[in-house]
């Protein structure tokens, strides 16, 4: 499992789950989903501490979304909920950076969200925590601070779809490879970020990352 500390170099994709916290869905005026909503970021989305967050060209409304990430430890295809936790090697925390103006335009046109979600650098990501450090991923606290002030803070027990459900559903449609990351959704509190902002995020008492916005 220790080899998964370098999961960013192993990953083939980042699977993201939309609207998995009721309060976030409602703050954007969206319906509560009846099944998981999935989209994918490319691995070029990853950036690490020391690299700046940069809005894509033309974006005027860039939002942050803090999310618990699940790191896959072995190839997973059409797995069951009862076995799903056996495919997890550890956890991380990331920001799903979203060009909200791009996304709003795509929604109106009935088009995919790809440009809004998967631009280069759209996934600032923290370090790796082995499963032994998080015995219950549904009982940790996500946080995100902007310029030192709380912007998002929520426990993971209020997810609409829990992690086994997400992994079972995802792997019915496509295979998860070793090192792939599944981002499990964001709570309420997303907001526009600006050049010069400092974003700090992580899991309370477990993991902390800090990024500057260019």
From Swiss-Prot:
Keywords linked to the UniProt accession:
Isomerase, Magnesium, Metal-binding, Mitochondrion
Q: List the disulfide bonds.
A: none
Q: In which tissues is it expressed?
A: Widely expressed.
Per the entry, the cofactor note is: Requires a divalent metal cation for activity.
Q: Under what name is this protein listed?
A: Oxaloacetate tautomerase fahd-1, mitochondrial
Q: Where in the cell is it found?
A: Mitochondrion
**Which InterPro entries does its entry note?**
Fumarylacetoacetase-like_C, Fumarylacetoacetase_C_sf
Recorded GO molecular functions are: acetylpyruvate hydrolase activity; metal ion binding; oxaloacetate tautomerase activity
**Protein purpose:** Tautomerase that converts enol-oxaloacetate, a strong inhibitor of succinate dehydrogenase, to the physiological keto form of oxaloacetate.
According to the UniProt record, one GO cellular component term is:
mitochondrion
Catalysed reaction(s)?
Answer: oxaloacetate = enol-oxaloacetate
Assign the protein's first listed, main location to one coarse class.
Answer: mitochondrion
Describe the outcome of a gene knockout: Reduced brood size, impaired egg-laying behavior and a severe locomotion deficit, characterized by a reduced frequency of body bends, reduced exploratory movements and reduced performance in an endurance exercise test. Cells show increased expression of enzymes involved in serotonin biosynthesis.
Source species of the chain = Caenorhabditis elegans
Q: Which cofactor does it need?
A: Mg(2+); Mn(2+)
Q: Which GO terms describe its biological process?
A: oxaloacetate metabolic process
Enzyme Commission number(s) of this protein: 5.3.2.2
Q: Could you say which residues bind Mg(2+) here?
A: 65, 67, 96
What is the similarity comment for this entry?
Belongs to the FAH family.
């Amino acid at each position: 499992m220790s080899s998964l500390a370098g999961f960013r170099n192993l990953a083939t994709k980042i699977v993201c789950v939309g609207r998995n916290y009721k309060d976030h869905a409602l703050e954007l005026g969206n319906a509560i989903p009846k099944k998981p909503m999935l989209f994918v970021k490319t691995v070029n989305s990853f950036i690490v501490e020391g690299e700046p967050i940069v809005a894509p060209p033309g974006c005027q409304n860039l939002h942050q979304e803090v999310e618990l990430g699940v790191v896959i430890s072995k190839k997973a295809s059409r797995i069951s909920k009862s076995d799903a936790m056996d495919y997890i090697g550890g956890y991380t925390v990331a920001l799903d950076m979203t060009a909200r103006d791009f996304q709003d335009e795509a929604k109106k046109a009935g088009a995919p969200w790809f440009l809004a979600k998967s631009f280069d650098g759209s996934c600032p990501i923290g370090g790796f925590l082995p499963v032994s450090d998080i015995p219950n991923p549904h009982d940790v606290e996500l946080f995100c601070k902007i310029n030192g002030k709380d912007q998002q803070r929520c426990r993971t027990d209020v997810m609409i779809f829990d992690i086994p459900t997400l992994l079972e559903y995802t792997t019915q449609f496509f295979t998860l490879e070793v090192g792939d990351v599944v981002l499990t959704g964001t709570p309420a509190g997303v907001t526009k970020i600006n050049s010069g902002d400092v974003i700090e995020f992580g899991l309370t008492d477990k993991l902390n990352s800090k990024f500057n916005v260019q």
